[in-house]
Amino acid sequence: MQLQTSYSNIRGVCHNPDPAKSPEQVELELSCAERLQINSVRFWLQQEKWEADPNGYFDLVEDFIHRCYAHGISSMPIFWNGNPIAEFKEPTEDDWKRMEEFAAAAIERFGDDPAILMWDVMNEPYCNDYIRKCPDPALVPERMENLKRMVRRMCDIVRRLDPDGVLTVGHEFIWHNESTVDLVDVISFHDYLKTRAEIEAVYQQAEELSAKTGKPLLNTETGCIGRSNPYDVELEICQQHQVGWYLFDLVAEGFWGDIHGIIYPDGTIRDPAIIAAMFGFFRKRTGGRILPNPNKEGYAYQAIKAVEDVLSVEETALFLSKVKTSDDILEAAERCVNILEANELVPMWDLPSARIEEWRAQPEAERDLHAIKQFAYDMAKRLKEHCLIL
């Protein structure tokens, strides 16, 4: 572990060791991270799990750290987390003793491991219900001071146990760094702000604090599709300011899966725009954009006609007609779907082509033929409307 003058090279994600995942699943996810040129992970240590099973828990963490490192990925473990604090009770000396024993054990086990980039002493000390649901705004400064006193002592513990280690605190807002900046080596802030102007202002404040203190910067959490903080916008501004970043988080799953995550557990991706942004390619938001013309060569006519033909009754003799299989209908529907998706005329989070693949994976006898016909009809109708076809 060695302090760097700049961490602008960091392309990180938040990604936790999970005892419920098989080694094969862990490897799949880390292989995807390596392909995305991720070079660091930030994850939460859990004191309670260590206290329950010291060796077993740290074996899990060590295995995760070394698997990451084998893929060229460093680790930033977080000792403690401020988010669950709903009520503040001054830690007793026994509490502090337990915290110190936990930190000492982690530092002894992992402190000299080349896989460790730095220690994050505490995640978001002031982002919790103790502050956010304070019944009287006049009490907020006192509550902030209580938490400040606690996190500073935590910093002192880690520094005393690892004098040469690299320390940061993952603050929710850049201005929260004023409470610990004298105790850490790296300025760390999180950014879930809602507009480009707000994000730019934060980076300017961060750069000013970095220049004032002579300490490098890191954005250790960012990106959320539910907070007006899209990954591609955030990454564009990160890259413009040459600040290293950690996206929250690698895998779309669990509690946060509906608004966070860049890949699914099977290695498929949520949004190609996120992946493109990670490599410096961004949507065009200036003049000169070209409106797609899905029917320029008449292929929309052909796709719609294919659906009309497959849904029509084709008489072969009196009272008889040619049977159209579900495969025939899906094949015709796919022509409309491919045009709709390629021109981004349908919601890309719920791809119609995914429904086609789900039906094709079913045995013919188990498919809902009426639902497939309705789907094909809807896709052709939608393409007609977009192409202004009567």
What role is predicted for each listed range?
Residues 2-184, 222, 234, 241-245, ...:
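Active-site mouth of glycoside hydrolases
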Residues 11, 213-218:
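Short, surface-exposed connector motifs at secondary-structure boundaries
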Residues 191-196, 250-251:
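Short, acidic/turn-prone active-site loops that include or flank metal/cofactor-
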Residues 195-205:
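Substrate-binding surface in catalytic domains of secreted glycosidases
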Residues 216-302:
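Substrate-binding cleft of secreted/luminal carbohydrate-active enzymes
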Residues 300-310:
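Disulfide-bonded cysteine-rich modules in secreted/extracellular proteins
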Residues 309-372, 377-390:
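Long, low-complexity or tandemly repetitive, helically biased scaffold regions used
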